[in-house]
């Protein structure tokens, strides 16, 4: 409580294509309220402030246009404590380089805040090493496949961006 006002816990937002696996995983990992937004909803704005915004990657391949994903990143970056963004594409790297509050994740770029290394599918389990600047831990996720790697990485990055320790987040992810 601050004075006679209750302190409001701001939610986390996931910008994607609707009912996303990333949002489901992030809810279960953190117990936070997670608001799902389409890129159009994110770009239209609003008054909400978020603890973190996780922007899923579904980039267009036309360099002449700003993708819906990029428009959402830019629109929400002023209304969040931190934007969680993949840096495996040029647009994500450009955004991360020009924004002060970015938590980056990648499938293999070790300079990201969270990187997946040694990714493999073994016995119907997605296994990868999660590398941060301070930690390295093996992550195991049942029934994984390559496209789902980004959902799990985005949720893990979102959890880390709001302060959950990597070891705790990886352990919880393994139980989902």
Identify the meaning behind each predicted range.
Residues 2-34, 45-176:
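Acidic, Mg2+-coordinating active-site environments of NTP-dependent enzymes
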Residues 40-42:
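N-terminal basic/disordered segments at the start of proteins
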């Amino acid at each position: 409580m601050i004075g006679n006002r209750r302190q409001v816990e701001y939610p986390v937002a996931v910008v994607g294509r609707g009912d996303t696996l990333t949002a489901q995983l992030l809810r279960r990992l953190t117990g936070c309220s997670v608001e799902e937004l389409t890129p159009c909803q994110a770009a239209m704005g609003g008054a909400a402030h978020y603890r973190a915004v996780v922007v899923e990657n579904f980039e267009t391949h036309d360099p002449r246009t700003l993708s819906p994903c990029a428009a959402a990143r830019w629109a929400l970056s002023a209304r969040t404590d931190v934007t969680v963004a993949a840096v495996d594409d040029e647009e994500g790297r450009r955004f991360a380089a020009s924004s002060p509050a970015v938590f980056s994740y990648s499938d293999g770029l070790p300079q990201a805040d969270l990187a997946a290394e040694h990714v493999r599918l073994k016995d119907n389990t997605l296994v990868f090493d999660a590398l941060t600047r301070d930690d390295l831990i093996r992550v195991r996720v049942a029934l994984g496949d390559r496209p789902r790697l980004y959902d799990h990485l985005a949720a893990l990055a979102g959890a880390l961006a709001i302060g959950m320790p990597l070891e705790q987040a990886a352990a919880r992810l393994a139980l989902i």
